[in-house]
Regions:
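A short beta-strand-to-loop transition that corresponds to the Sensor-1 phosphate-sensing loop
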Residues: 36-38, 64, 197-200
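Extended helical coiled-coil dimerization/tether regions that scaffold
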Residues: 12-17, 26, 39-145, 149-156, ...
């Protein structure tokens, strides 16, 4: 709410070294995306808000619906399909998705799936082939594919992405590939991310300015 509440927030940036503070302007971030796949987290995601005229947009990527209700596999698959269609509806997004998949293919299992071939299809044929692919994936690979596809579909300039402990559901090689794909996407879109993590793999993959 500190970021998405239009005209109501008293949130500020703090410079801990200089003891200075600066209010966060209503339009500082264009959108906020929160990513959390913990089924036991007490966090209840707000309703998605995709309309920029109402303030900062908000998108949620995770397992929860409303309250304590969790999404089923069909919900997750449908969410992926809708995001994929959004990615393929615009050439720049399509190219960013293909670049992200290319980075993820440093993971051998991802490389063997032939995901980039989906870009050759559209309409019902795309839906059928994409649904078949995600149904055969392990939970970790499905989570990464859903997450990166939705991020490509939603991240715009000055988007803030919040990610909660990605290592909790991803093996190290896949986690490493995901963080690299995320970094490349955010660099391309001039976005930023805050990641809550205990993983040295995540820290290892975070880009460092010279």
């Amino acid at each position: 709410e500190a970021i998405t509440s239009k005209g109501q927030s008293t949130a500020k940036f703090y410079d801990v070294e200089g003891w200075q503070e600066e209010p966060i302007a209503n339009d500082y971030f264009s959108s906020l995306v929160s990513v959390s796949f913990s089924a036991f987290d007490p966090f209840e995601p707000p309703r998605e808000q995709p309309d920029p005229s109402l303030g900062t947009c908000y998108f949620y990527i995770g397992l929860k619906k409303e309250g304590d209700t969790l999404k089923g596999l069909n919900d997750i698959h449908q969410e992926f399909l809708e995001a994929l269609k959004s990615c393929f509806s615009q050439l720049p997004r399509r190219d960013r998705w293909l670049k992200a998949i290319d980075t993820l293919e440093s993971d051998e299992n991802f490389a063997s799936m032939g995901l980039k071939g989906l870009a050759e299809f559209s309409g019902e044929e795309l839906t059928t082939k994409a649904r078949k692919m995600i149904k055969t994936m392990s939970s970790g690979h499905a989570v990464v594919l859903l997450t990166i596809t939705r991020l490509v579909a939603t991240v715009e300039e000055k988007t803030l992405v919040l990610i909660d402990e990605p290592e909790s559901h991803l093996p190290p090689p896949l986690l490493s590939a995901f963080i690299r794909a995320l970094s490349e996407l955010l660099y391309d879109r001039n976005g930023v991310s805050i990641i809550a993590t205990h993983s040295p793999v995540v820290l290892q993959e975070i880009p460092r300015s010279s």
